[in-house]
Amino acid sequence: MDGKVVVVTGASMGIGEAIAMVFADHGASVVLLSRDASRAEAARHRVGHTERTLALACDVRNREEIDRVVGLTLHYFDRIDVWVNNAGVGIRDSVADMEMQACRELFETNFFGAVACLQAVVPAMRQAGGGTIINISSVAGHVPVPFMTPYSATKFALNAIGKGARLELKRDNINVLTVCPGYIQTEFGSHMVAAKRGNVRPQSMKGITAERVARATYEGYRKRKREVIVPWTMIPVVKLYQLLPGLVEWGMGRAIK
């Protein structure tokens, strides 16, 4: 990774910070993005390698801010080899009761924000002769999760557009990798499944660490994979849902309060 430049959105904590650390540990220069500049800077110091890392404020819902950080990254490092779309938010509610504005805001960050970042960085990658775009999605983008259905919908959409973009950008030597983690032991994940009537019980999911997701992401990048599902034990669940959705729905129903 020496000489490579990696940009990570939503990098102030959790998966984003862990991904930034893994790539930096392998020799890459890393730009950490977060809506809160001070939190991005704090994460940068936790990541280390401060001589080749940069922290910038960026709200992925704002195309002007995305274009600004693309320009600054090119100014400081002359290139962008990898862009990681990790920024995301979640809401916990039933489809019948959710507020439409909250649902729209969810899509603005989780889906439209990722698409805007892709569109902003592709020209630089084309000019450089290639690159990699990594979308941090979710197993919930394969198997809808009750009372997290709006979140699942954003990840279904992200999975589809990432895999479609992969086909479209192959001729430009740009690989698009989709990473689908299961339940993760992060602040974000604990909020998503916090105890509440109608939510999936947190004790029913042990969860994996952000560091494990980051390592799987790096390996997927290194091998130019199309998709990574982590942990591997979720792969049979995804395949089973495709073949026998009723059986998976029965099992999920038993986990709902």
Q: Which stretches of residues belong to each language-model region?
A:
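Active-site helix of classical SDR
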Residues: 118, 154
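The beta1-alpha1 cofactor-binding region of Rossmann-like NAD(H)/NADP(H)-dependent oxidoreductases
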Residues: 37, 57-68, 100
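Conserved glycine-rich cofactor-binding loop
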Residues: 5, 12-13
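Conserved glycine-rich Rossmann-like NAD(P)H-binding loop of the short-chain dehydrogenase/reductase
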Residues: 26-43
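Substrate-binding pocket helix/loop in short-chain dehydrogenase/reductase
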Residues: 94-95, 99-104
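SDR active-site lid
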Residues: 171-232
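Residue(s) in the substrate-gating loop at a strand-loop-helix junction
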Residues: 138
